């Protein structure tokens, strides 16, 4: 079996599919194969719970999401002020990548979080400015 070697400063990647009431979160830890899933309600208590969970990894954290209406703004602000690197994924690029990876236009929140994570892994993300 091949041992996975990861740089000490490799960031934890966090992909978030934004929605009105709840956000689907997919977390990829550099030295682990399994990914962690979370559902975060669109309220401050859950934002704090997510920020605390991310700080516990003791590594740099990079968060990316697709801007969806104004629903992303509160969470993005909270994560940015908590010291995390916040990125944006283009809606058009996300749709095209989802179609290419899944050979389908089918869309659901966990699948979108996986596609956002894939886009982060290949570096297809933009700086977030609010």
Label each residue range with its predicted role:
Residues 1-130:
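Phosphate- and other anionic-substrate recognition elements at nucleic-acid/protein interfaces
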């Amino acid at each position: 079996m091949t041992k996975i070697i990861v740089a000490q400063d490799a960031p934890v990647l966090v992909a978030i599919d934004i929605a009105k009431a709840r956000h689907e979160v997919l977390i990829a830890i550099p030295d682990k194969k399994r990914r962690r899933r979370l559902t975060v309600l669109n309220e401050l208590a859950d934002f704090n719970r997510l920020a605390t969970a991310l700080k516990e990894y003791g590594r740099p954290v990079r968060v990316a999401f697709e801007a969806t209406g104004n629903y992303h703004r509160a969470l993005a602000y909270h994560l940015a002020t908590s010291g995390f690197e916040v990125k944006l994924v283009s809606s058009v690029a996300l749709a095209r990548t989802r179609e290419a990876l899944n050979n389908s236009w089918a869309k659901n929140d966990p699948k979108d979080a996986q596609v956002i994570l894939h886009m982060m892994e290949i570096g297809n993300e933009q700086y977030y400015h609010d």
